[in-house]
């Protein structure tokens, strides 16, 4: 009888944490993009559109001027500080979201969805981390401007180009934040079933990302 109860409890744990992971993609991605969008909306940039995994506006001429280091021309299209703020607003929104999830776990209850969203929202730093690592240890790496012209594109890189703050410093802060909040959230995985909960949550996240990127997102915000 006890074995049946244990199996049932394990199954319930797996189901709860899988279900929590199912909301991770939309709730982990959209606040980040809305952060970008709201700042750009306040700036009044042309042709601004919010998409399910990004924000677009008529930025080609702005960045062409930046690549030429013609900042005076770029500033006539949009204020450099404003574009830098819009690029920083996404990560800042993510930090606020993660802190809100942590606060919810601590003061309300450790709902699996809160834990899943907090972890998923920070997964975006992976690409930036790879670039920052190469920037630190490869002296032959092109400049940030050249790297962006060659296709590198993430928030911290654009902020670095417009403000002069080094990419490794921005990414380093994000990694410290991830390590601190990630370690703190581990306490909310159920004791004795942490592996079951973690694996189920990750599977739910994967399903969430596939569904959001492939179906829900394009339908909601093409």
Residue ranges with predicted function:
Residues 64-186, 208:
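Metalloprotease/metallohydrolase-associated module, dominated by Zn2+-dependent proteases
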Residues 18-23, 83, 87:
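Hydrophobic alpha-helical segments, chiefly the membrane-spanning helices
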Residues 111-115, 190-203:
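Membrane-interfacial entry segments at the cytosolic side of transmembrane helices
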Residues 37, 41-49, 102, 106, ...:
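Transmembrane helix-loop junctions in multipass membrane proteins, especially transporters and channels
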Residues 20-79:
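Small-residue-rich helix-interface/hinge motifs
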Residues 210-222:
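Juxtamembrane boundary at the C-terminal end of a transmembrane helix
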Residues 14-18, 104, 175, 179-183, ...:
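Alpha-helical hydrophobic membrane-insertion segments
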Residues 1-11:
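Short, Lys/Arg-rich, polar N-terminal cytosolic tail immediately upstream
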């Amino acid at each position: 009888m006890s074995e049946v109860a244990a199996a049932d409890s394990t199954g319930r744990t797996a189901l709860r944490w899988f279900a929590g992971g199912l909301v991770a993609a939309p709730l982990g991605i959209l606040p980040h993009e809305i952060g970008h969008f709201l700042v750009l909306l306040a700036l009044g940039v042309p042709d601004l559109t919010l998409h399910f995994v990004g924000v677009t506006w008529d930025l080609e001429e702005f960045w062409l001027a930046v690549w030429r280091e013609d900042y005076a021309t770029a500033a006539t299209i949009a204020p450099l500080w404003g574009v830098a703020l819009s690029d920083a607003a996404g990560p800042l929104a993510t930090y606020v979201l993660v802190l809100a999830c942590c606060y919810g776990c601590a003061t309300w209850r450790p709902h699996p969805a809160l834990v899943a969203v907090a972890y998923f929202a920070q997964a975006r730093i992976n690409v930036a981390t790879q670039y920052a690592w190469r920037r630190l240890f490869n002296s032959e790496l092109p400049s940030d401007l050249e790297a962006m012209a060659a296709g590198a594109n993430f928030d911290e890189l654009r902020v670095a180009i417009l403000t002069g703050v080094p990419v490794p410093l921005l990414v380093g802060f994000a990694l410290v934040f991830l390590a601190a909040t990630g370690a703190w959230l581990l306490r909310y995985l159920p004791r004795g079933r942490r592996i079951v909960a973690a694996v189920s949550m990750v599977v739910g996240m994967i399903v969430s990302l596939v569904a959001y990127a492939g179906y829900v997102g394009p339908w909601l915000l093409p």
